Amino acid sequence: MELLVEKNIKNALKMPVSSGGQTIGEYEPRAYPQVIKYMGSKAQILDFVGDGLSAVSAHGRPLVDLFAGACAITAGFGDRFKVVSNDIQEYSSVIASTYLKRAESIGNFDLVALASVIAERNIAELPATMHYPATSTLASFNKIEKCNRSLLMKEFSTSHHLFTQIYSGTWWSAEQCIWIDAIREVLDGLYQDGHILKADFNFGLTCLLHAMAYTSQGTGHYAQYRDAKTVEGMADINKYRRTSVPVIFRRKFDLLLAWHLKHVVDLDHELVALDYRVCLGKIKKSVVYADPPYAFVHYSRFYHAMETLVRYDYPELQFMKDSVVKGRYRVDRHQSPFCIKTQVQGAFVDMFEGVKDSKSDLLLSYSNTGMINIDELIGLANNTFGRGYRVWFEEMNHTHMTMGRSKDRSRKVMESLIIAKKL
């Protein structure tokens, strides 16, 4: 079958009224507060995605955010569509909840004050050798780091010590980890005792994910923490070591809650954490937005700590040569077929078939940093969707965030939106 490749959708996008009777302006995304640092975030291209939604006359159908990640699409269009926000990583549905589900009770509690009772008691029990002074020699600083990391082998009797045990001296200090555990303990207690509902719990957890991100000494993700090898590097790491988790948490909590109460309307949104194939098998006729993590590295390697905070399940950690790997990776972290060269084609075919089976339309984000050539991808789309669909794409320049601390913090990429519309 001859490939149907149309590189320009400008004529479709210039139409003042779509076939569904909706003007293009109705697909403009709302402004929203971001909560975590996330590589490849689509927050900068929401207008571009809105044009794609207009081109398929999306109004009146659910919007399925199939690989929601940090939830840029979910957040940007959650006031205009019923959103099905899906990602196999559970932290994504927690963030999505903050943009989609009303948290009516969480503002009644001072979470920091409640957590301080727990945190201050546990911090007082830390040996003096674990505290970070404002200034230090490189050798002394690394001794403190090693002392913090020694908590990995300690036996704890408290109910909430996951971060203190696993992550002290890595991306966070022991003191910061104690605060993370304490806030999580308060949220668990309020939820289990019925003082807050699930949406409130998720809101608080989202703010804690934010506090984690902005007190971490890493580069914006959790692949590996930095070692202090130079005086300059030590000074930068120590700046983050001495940053207050409760201060960052409370600041974000107040700002985010003000936005949340003003803008969030529950349009019968759905939050799911499923394999993309399972999710597609459950949907009705929709518009599916897909931004799969097709790169040579697995995103779970970068965001496993967030998944662990959300699941709070004291995971088994990966070992190498009888030692826990530096990244503190979970043994069960997700491995995406889109990140495996031998599986990526089949993964896309499965996605196309799932969209076709539900008679949905597809908006697929593609960037030229991916593992598969765009012509090859469009060929797969045409062969899978067949004559019952029209397939085309549009391009734009986009700055992709790499999360490097100094060099190559971002790079220019060509972002494409591949569109498959049922005829």
Language-model region placement:
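Conserved Class I SAM-dependent methyltransferase catalytic core
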Residues: 333-386, 395
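SAM-dependent nucleic-acid methyltransferase catalytic core
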Residues: 26, 45-46, 51, 154-302, ...
